[in-house]
């Protein structure tokens, strides 16, 4: 069972790299959701999975993800992965749209999947949004050694 769940979770990222959003939707349970934990943003059901996937692809048309580590236990699969791309399109964010910057980024991410009966019920996505915003040049670099 855990190996089946690993295969399902991995295929989500393979489909994203190939921009096969219809196949991503097929992996999602009708009542499943993707949650961007840091901003408490929710994408519900297969249509939400497409919206989530398209959001990143619109912002980073050349974007690719590479899975670095996988841990599975029962219904849960944790994937650490690296995303790379150049923001040549607009990127939706919880605070509004970020216009294309033309900058390339490398982002470390971690997703926790809950998979039951062959479908994804929940994806909790964790990433360092401050690092992403600094790499895009829309947030100033943190001052090293600054004191409050």
Residue ranges and their predicted role:
Residues 1-148:
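C-terminal and inter-domain tail/linker signature
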């Amino acid at each position: 069972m855990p190996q089946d769940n690993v295969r399902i979770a991995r295929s989500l990222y393979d489909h994203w790299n190939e921009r096969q959003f219809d196949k991503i939707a097929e992996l999602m349970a009708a009542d499943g959701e993707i949650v961007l934990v840091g901003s408490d943003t929710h994408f519900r059901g297969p249509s939400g999975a497409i919206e989530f996937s398209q959001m990143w692809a619109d912002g980073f048309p050349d974007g690719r993800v590479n899975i670095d580590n996988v841990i599975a236990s029962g219904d849960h699969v944790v994937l650490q992965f690296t995303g790379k791309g150049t923001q040549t399109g607009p990127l939706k964010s919880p605070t509004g749209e970020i216009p294309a910057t033309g900058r390339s980024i490398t982002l470390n991410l971690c997703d926790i999947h809950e998979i039951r009966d062959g479908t994804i019920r929940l994806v909790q996505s964790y990433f360092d949004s401050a690092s992403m915003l600094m790499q895009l040049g829309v947030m100033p670099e943190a001052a090293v050694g600054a004191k409050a």
